[in-house]
A protein has these predicted regions:
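A general alpha-helix detector
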Residues: 16-20, 36, 54
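Short, Lys/Arg-enriched anionic-surface-contact patches
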Residues: 33-52
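Short, amphipathic alpha-helical "recognition" segments used to contact nucleic acids or chromatin
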Residues: 49-63
Length: 104
């Protein structure tokens, strides 16, 4: 029974995440997106998201070491390493897609 409950929860999480992604994609502009994110996230969550995105851009530039990024941003080397792993190794490709879109 607990396996069925856990499977249902995982499905619900995946469905809710997909609905959130679609909602974000459907917002008309950056200002509306920012308003939605401010309502949706705590200040700490928003700070973490914006820090990760900043780190992704710095890593993509390839000019700074993890320690230099840490010194410049205050973001932990653990977080920097996690962003680097998702940027370079994980199959999702979200960071890469967003960075490419910035360059286009």
């Amino acid at each position: 029974m607990t396996d069925m409950i856990e499977k249902t929860r995982q499905t619900d999480v995946a469905t809710r995440r997909a609905l959130l992604a679609q909602t974000l994609a459907d917002l008309p502009d950056a200002a509306t997106m920012e308003q939605f994110l401010i309502d949706l996230c705590t200040p700490a969550e928003l700070r973490a998201l914006s820090e990760r995105w900043h780190v992704a851009k710095l890593l993509d530039e390839g000019k700074l070491s993890y320690r230099e990024i840490n010194a410049r941003t205050g973001v932990s080397t653990t977080t920097i390493g996690r962003v680097a792993r998702f940027l370079n190794e994980e199959p999702h490709g979200g960071y890469r897609t967003a960075l490419k879109q910035l360059k286009d």
